[in-house]
Amino acid sequence: MAEAAAERDAREKLSLWDGRPDSMAPLTDRQTDSVLELKAAVENLPVPAELPIEDVCSLASQSLPIELTAVVPDSTEDILLKGFTSLGMEEERIETAQQFFSWFAKLQTQMDQDEGTKYRQMRDYLSGFQEQCDAILNDVNSALQHLESLQKQYLFVSNKTGTLHEACEQLLKEQSELADLAEHIQQKLSYFNELETINTKLNSPTLSVNSEGFIPMLAKLDDCITYISSHPNFKDYPVYLLKFKQCLSKALHLMKTYTVNTLQTLTNQLLKRDPSSVPNADNAFTLFYVKFRAAAPKVRTLIEQIEQRSEKIPEYQHLLNDIHQCYLDQRELLLGPSIAYTVTELTSQNNRDHCALVRSGCAFMVHVCQDEHQLYNEFFTKPTSKLDELLEKLCVSLYDVFRPLIIHVIHLETLSELCGILKNEVLEDHVQHNAEQLGAFAAGVKQMLEDVQERLVYRTHIYIQTDITGYKPAPGDLAYPDKLVMMEQIAQSLKDEQKKAPSEASFSDVRLEEGEASGLRKSGSTDSLNPRPQTTISPADLHGMWYPTVRRTLVCLSKLYRCIDRAVFQGLSQEALSACIQSLLGASESISKNKTQIDGQLFLIKHLLILREQIAPFHTEFTIKEISLDLKKTRDAAFKILNPMTVPRFFRLNSNNALIEFLLEGTPEIREHYLDSKKDVDRHLKSACEQFIQQQTRLFGEQLEEFMTKVSALKTMASQGGPKYTLSQQPWAQPAKVNDLVATAYKTIKTKLPLTLRSMALYLSNKDTEFILFKPVRNNIQQVFQKFHALLKEEFSSEDIQIIACPSMEQLNLLLSVSK
């Protein structure tokens, strides 16, 4: 019982080992899996061999594995034999109970032993493992000790190695820095070391500027000078810079000598060809250009090197200037005599034709300037102002020949044509399209143009004074209207001949109807007078029929318009038009004295219309500004200060001092006056038209106006208290007298109106202009008759009105009607 209790207690304690809530000996998942595998294997253990057959047979057949059925002994004896043999009792027999219990005890002991054998074997097996594990632990501990020692040694060696590595890196860094420093020093010293090499090459007698090594040596020399110049803090800086400068001077001297000798040799070769004669224009190109162009490649490469360095190094710029000067001197030496000879020859050929001389001379200089620029570009790549200076000097020879001729030209036609040639043909057509090459030539041409314009302005002033202001008209110039009638008759006869022979056109007919029409605008048809184109040209509109001063003024202005500046033209046009208007006024007065007043008035109106029409195409203002000094305030202030009443105010120390007032109030004023020639023409035209209208109105209605004036005076006297009157009883206002007055006025209109209209048609020859000019006259006459009709109705009876027999307004309008 005690053993059962102990076994039960042990099992309870064993059950607590792996209890879920509080396990005393918890197993890992792997250990649990191992136990489960062992449990599954134990469930299929074979039946022990020593088990009695009866026990074996008593076992349920389903509980025995299939494998055991094959090993069941054939007889009980064999089983018992094996069991006794295993117990060492094969010779014994159980015959008594004591033997049985003894056998049973042995069997139980044997079974207990057999049952504990596997545990002991496992214990022994595990003990072996334990011993091996202890040995391994000892080895591991020993290895750990060795590793710890090795780690200490490794740390020691690592520290030493790191220190050595850092030292090596520092040494390598210092070595690299020293190498870089040495290389940097060597690089800097290389510029200094080049001195001996360059100096040796420059002192070599075989050195030539055309050799292959000269340009690279020159580049090295430039680099050395540039480097040393940029490091003035180097030791021996002045010494080396001076030595390199000396080398540069030698190199520049070699280049200058070679270039100058080449250019001078070319010049000498050309001059030695024919020293006795000056080259003419035909072989000048061959002599002066072909040779130089052939020699250009010899020096162009060298000059390019100089030009590339000229902006960086001043010595090269000086050398380039010297080469430019040498080249231009040689060109001047060659071209100077040739150009002078050619200009002289052109002058002798065109001595009387100034325009042809200017054209040929300018064309020659244009070719010279273009050829010189092209030749210069063969030698040089960069421009220079010295070339233009040379060309300007060469153009001076042309100017020196032309100027004496220009200042002696007196004809405005020649001067205006010269202006047109220089301004249009030369400057606009040639210079503007090639301004770079012809810049120097343009300066000379502009100077010539200024001289021609100045001469033209001067001659224009003289022309205005002599030929316009001082013009003395010939009798034929004032033969109006006779010359117009004669020209009209000639034109009519030509028309009649043309009708008879329509297929034949005479020269005179073409000249009258076509030539003048194409060259002139239709005169008298201005915008303000409502123009209407005409199919034929009136004799008054022919250019040759204009008054000479008008023709001269317009021709003069037409020549000046495109030749001089706008401001100068405005001043001259003002002067010319003013002189022309004065001459027309004088001519009109002379015609009025010699012929009739209407002839003088229509002459003036016609020519003022021509003037206004012909100056309209000039797209400019005919306005000039005149400045004058107005001394009126100064004069008033002076009279005021000289007044005896103001003498005490001289000594006042306030703003009422007389001297201060004189200084403040006596300042002269500057006045500006604007003179407009177009407005002046319009003003005189308006005045002439008004005079014509007034004169014609007086001619046709003066008697009636005088009668109405007397009636107005009589009414005034009566209204002021005078005696009452009856107009028909007045001696001068009797119906018969008034009838004579009306008949005379009507007869005057009927007889003289056709003459007036005929004169207007003869002078103006434009229906629109005639209608516009006569319309105010007709209106004035109509107003006079309307007033007269009103007076008759007011002052006379119907019987008296019948006696007076004044024409009706319809009759008057029919008489005054003028078809447009």
From Swiss-Prot:
InterPro entries: COG3_C, COG3_N, COG_su3. It comes from the Eukaryota. Its main location: Golgi. Belongs to the COG3 family. Involved in ER-Golgi transport. Also involved in retrograde (Golgi to ER) transport. It is found in: Golgi apparatus, Golgi stack membrane. This is Conserved oligomeric Golgi complex subunit 3. The lineage of its organism: Eukaryota, Metazoa, Chordata, Craniata, Vertebrata.
